């Protein structure tokens, strides 16, 4: 019964480490070889992967409550970073899903109750931009023509029509998410949480209003976050397309301008030459700065120069923090440059704004000839006017410069001084830093700890307001009483009534009495809610408080520390966060700050960060470069014409579209082959060994496709010979198998059998150790090597000789009987397919859920035992065996001889 015992042992091992169902339950399903896929002549991802997701969902396999012994099972919780509801699945999403799904399935394999929560982000700027462009294209109207509420209604219409697109694409990748907990960051529960959190922070004195320098998008007429700013390096003269201009705009050029000195010293310089890349901002110049270490300008501090355009005098000041000695000078424009603004603050200089929110020159009598002109029109006119005054000394290429561009609109960022709402971050940042330093939160890879510490110790207050219509409107109200007494207050509240009451409570007793008397005399109270909305990172930073709030009473506040502590572990709200390292500050750090402030415990105990995905040449993926790899095109296949049509449906300029389509034809002349989701997932897991950045190539996907094909053919080979292997679907009794294995007699195992089983156990050990340490590339590589080298290229080929009767006497002595090889194939595939199912999702899903057991063979006779003993002795005694056989094989053969001899001796008694 040795073959049956080994078969049951390995099946038991599979049940323990793999679990026959993805939800962590052991069961036996219909026979694999009766399914239609068995009739395929070759591997087809489209057919193999079809219908599995609906089958999984119908049986609730991703529901953490349906795991065996759910009430006592260890809990594992994880949040999927919410993709934008406006978007489609991009390769970064696919990487995140592949990693998180492998982690989720592995934890289910170990019997844990896995709660992997999905959702979508309302994508403030992105969503508003998409709907605005659609509105203008279809009706010729702007959002201002519709009005705020009507436009928001249009956004909701778009969301209801198109919002499920990315959800369906996520399912096509096989992500085993708990859709019962799905959220949208503008749904009522989340909106209430965001509102409550803001009011609490405001009342605690952590949110304030201030005028500071911000990154302003004139096209969007809103502040944008740093992650939405693309830094474009230039070397020399560079032409860049800018929205609203017919011709490209020139950048990377230094314009030289002469400023005459007022009352120059005898034998001293008569003027100071200044170089600037932004002559259009000269209208706001308030001073000329020089470096005190520059001998050329000694004695000029305290003097004045004449502004060549405005005919007014501006002072010369020393500022070594601002002026680079290599340049020697610099004009100060505080309203449109962060460094200049800091200089103005140090020296008490006036701030003169040049451009308004729309990017046009403001109404100012000092430069009336420029009022209403765009930045680029102003640049041309300034240069022309400087030439007329002979103050323009020409231009030269700047060696290097950086142009800041809005990633959402393509517009050039304009630094502007704007009143905004800010969150004080110093104390919360220190808490978040301490959590990592003390080990309460682990960062993987560990090198990110230094980056985390550096950013959190230097972080500035967070601008949380945006000048949009779509988003969480900021719950702050401007309360004003006008009459004989003027009262002007900002308060955070849930309604106008509450705002008025909170404003009254802020007044002193004397102010209240005076206000009461003036109210009788006709004082009017106006309460107006701020027009701005919150940064989307603020709302997404609160997600763990919503997703993992375990309060039994839904009316309990998600911000209550006692409520939050009812989660799976009082150490954190969830178990793991896996996301891209590019948003470690924008999302991960801010989420840690906000959630810990409210819950008094961190939002997660482990943060796993993956690198950015770039193209094969290491370039950032961009539609204009034609190097974007759409996961759905990789999964389903796409002809070149389809890839190019996708570009045409976007919002690229004519030049960008031309370049993009040309690059597509160059890189993918035959389009994309249909590789399937499993090949893509497996590739992305293997690519995570690239720790700095992932250089994505279709060659890697093609290799994984061949891996899936080889795996498929292995299953097909086994089941094509099901009759010879006597496969059936009896339930596996794990406990009895363990006992049987303790008494195993391996007389029928061969050298090759034992070698393969040894490598199987080695692979399983490597796989589980790697998964436990979140080294997914190592786990995937261990599986790949075992399948391709050990199982397919070696053992299966030997088994074919055995099945088809092509062995000579020596080979049969080494390989043993057909029964032995047949048993070991089934035993090895059983735990292996379950491991692969955790990594790929579908190609091994059916075998993983239906892997069968083999009927027991008949008892060996004494004659057969003696014959087997002689065969083993002849092999073990050969010179070649003693020279080349691995020690583990020799040790096993020695035990085998001893067991055979003992069995024969017992039989003779």
Locate the predicted segments by residue.
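Flexible, glycine/threonine-enriched loop-and-boundary segments that flank and lead into catalytic domains
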Residues: 232, 236-266, 270-271, 460-462, ...
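Glycine-rich (often Gly-Gly/Gly-Pro-rich) flexible segments and glycine-rich loop motifs
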Residues: 476, 481-526, 635-662
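Secondary-structure transition/capping motifs at alpha-helix termini
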Residues: 105-113, 134-144, 168, 172-177, ...
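Short Cys/His-rich metal-coordination motifs, predominantly Zn2+-binding knuckles/fingers
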Residues: 220, 310, 409-410, 480-482, ...
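Long, charged, mostly alpha-helical binding arms that flank functional sites
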Residues: 40, 125, 133, 141, ...
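N-terminal, positively charged nucleic-acid-binding surface of large information/translation enzymes
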Residues: 2-3, 11, 22, 29-293, ...
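C-terminal low-complexity, glycine/proline- and small-hydrophobic-enriched intrinsically disordered tails
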Residues: 702, 809-909
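Structured ligand/cofactor/substrate-binding pocket environments in proteins
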Residues: 92-104, 120-121, 190-193, 210-211, ...
């Amino acid at each position: 019964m040795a073959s049956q015992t080994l078969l049951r042992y390995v099946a038991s091992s599979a049940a323990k480490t793999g679990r026959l169902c993805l939800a962590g339950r052991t069961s036996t399903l219909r026979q694999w070889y009766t399914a239609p896929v068995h009739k395929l002549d070759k591997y087809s991802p489209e057919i193999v992967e079809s219908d599995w997701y609906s089958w999984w969902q119908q049986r609730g396999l991703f529901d953490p409550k349906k795991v065996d012994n759910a009430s006592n099972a260890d809990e594992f919780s994880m949040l999927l970073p919410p993709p934008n509801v406006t978007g489609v699945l991009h390769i970064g999403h696919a990487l995140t899903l592949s990693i998180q799904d492998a982690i989720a399935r592995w934890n289910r394999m170990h019997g844990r109750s896995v709660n992997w929560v999905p959702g979508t982000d309302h994508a403030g700027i992105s969503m508003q931009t998409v709907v605005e462009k659609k509105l203008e294209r279809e009706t010729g109207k702007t959002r201002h023509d519709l009005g705020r509420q009507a436009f928001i209604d249009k956004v909701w219409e778009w969301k209801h029509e198109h919002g499920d697109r990315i959800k369906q694409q996520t399912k096509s990748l096989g992500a085993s998410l708990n859709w019962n907990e799905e959220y949208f960051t503008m749904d009522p529960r989340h909106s209430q949480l965001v509102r409550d959190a803001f009011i609490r922070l405001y009342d605690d004195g952590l949110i304030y209003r201030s005028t500071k320098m911000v990154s302003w998008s004139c096209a969007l007429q809103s502040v944008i976050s740093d992650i939405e700013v693309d830094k474009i390096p230039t070397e020399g003269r560079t032409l860049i397309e800018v929205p609203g201009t017919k011709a490209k705009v020139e950048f990377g050029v230094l314009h030289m301008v002469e400023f005459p000195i007022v009352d120059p010293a005898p034998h001293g310089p008569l003027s100071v030459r200044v170089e600037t890349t932004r002559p259009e901002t000269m209208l706001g110049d308030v001073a000329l700065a020089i470096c005190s270490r520059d001998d050329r300008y000694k004695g000029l501090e305290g003097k004045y120069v004449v502004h060549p355009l405005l005919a007014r005098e501006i002072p010369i000041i020393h500022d070594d923090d601002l002026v680079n000695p290599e340049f020697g000078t610099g004009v100060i424009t505080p309203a449109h440059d962060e460094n200049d603004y800091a200089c103005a603050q140090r020296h008490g200089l006036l701030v003169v704004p040049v451009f308004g929110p729309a990017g046009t020159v403001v109404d100012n009598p000092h430069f009336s000839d420029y009022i209403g002109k765009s930045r680029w029109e102003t640049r041309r006119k300034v240069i022309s006017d400087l030439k007329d005054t002979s103050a323009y000394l020409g231009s030269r290429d700047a060696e290097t410069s950086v142009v800041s561009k809005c990633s959402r609109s393509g517009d050039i960022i304009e630094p502007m001084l704007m009143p905004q709402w800010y969150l004080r971050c110093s104390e919360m940042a220190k808490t978040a830093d301490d959590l990592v330093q003390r080990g309460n939160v682990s960062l993987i890879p560990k090198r990110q700890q230094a980056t985390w510490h550096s950013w959190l110790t230097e972080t500035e207050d967070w601008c949380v307001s945006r000048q949009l219509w779509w988003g969480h409107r900021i719950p702050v109200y401007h309360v004003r009483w006008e009459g004989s007494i003027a009262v002007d207050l900002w308060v955070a509240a849930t309604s106008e009534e509450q705002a008025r009451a909170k404003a009254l409570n802020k007044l002193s007793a004397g102010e209240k009495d005076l206000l009461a008397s003036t109210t009788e005399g006709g004082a009017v109270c106006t309460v107006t809610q701020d027009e701005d909305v919150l940064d989307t990172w603020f709302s997404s930073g609160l997600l763990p408080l919503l997703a993992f709030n375990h309060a039994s009473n839904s009316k309990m506040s998600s911000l209550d520390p006692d409520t939050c502590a009812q989660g799976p572990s009082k150490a954190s709200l969830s178990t793991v966060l896996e996301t891209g390292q590019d948003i470690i500050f924008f999302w991960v750090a801010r989420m840690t700050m906000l959630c810990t402030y409210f819950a008094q415990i961190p939002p997660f105990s482990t943060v796993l960060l993956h690198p950015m995905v770039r193209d094969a040449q290491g370039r950032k993926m961009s539609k204009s470069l034609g190097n974007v790899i759409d996961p759905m095109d990789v999964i389903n296949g796409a002809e070149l014409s389809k890839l190019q049509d996708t570009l045409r449906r976007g919002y690229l300029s004519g030049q960008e579209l031309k370049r993009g389509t040309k690059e597509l034809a160059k890189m993918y002349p035959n389009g994309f082959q249909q590789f399937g989701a499993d090949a893509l997932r497996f590739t992305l897991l293997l690519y995570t060994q690239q720790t700095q950045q992932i250089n994505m190539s279709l060659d890697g996907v093609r290799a994984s496709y061949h891996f899936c094909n080889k795996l498929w053919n292995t299953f097909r080979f086994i089941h094509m010979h099901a009759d010879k292997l006597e496969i059936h679907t009896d339930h596996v009794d794990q406990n009895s198998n363990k006992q049987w294995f303790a008494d195993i007699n391996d007389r029928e195992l061969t050298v090759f059998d034992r070698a393969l089983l040894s490598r199987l156990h080695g692979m399983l050990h490597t796989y589980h150790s790697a998964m436990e340490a979140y080294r997914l590339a190592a786990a995937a590589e261990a599986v790949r090597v075992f399948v391709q080298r050990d199982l397919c290229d070696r053992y299966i080929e030997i088994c074919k000789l055995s099945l088809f009767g092509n062995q000579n006497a020596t080979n049969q002595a080494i390989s043993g009987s057909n029964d032995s090889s047949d048993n070991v194939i089934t035993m090895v595939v059983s735990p292996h397919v379950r491991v692969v199912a955790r990594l790929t999702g579908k190609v091994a899903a059916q075998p993983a859920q239906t892997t069968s057991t083999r009927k027991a063979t008949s008892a060996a006779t004494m004659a057969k035992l003696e014959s087997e003993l002689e065969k083993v002795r002849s092999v073990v005694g050969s010179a070649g065996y003693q020279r080349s056989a691995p020690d583990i094989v020799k040790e096993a053969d020695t035990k085998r001889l001893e067991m055979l001899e003992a069995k024969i001796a017992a039989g003779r008694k």
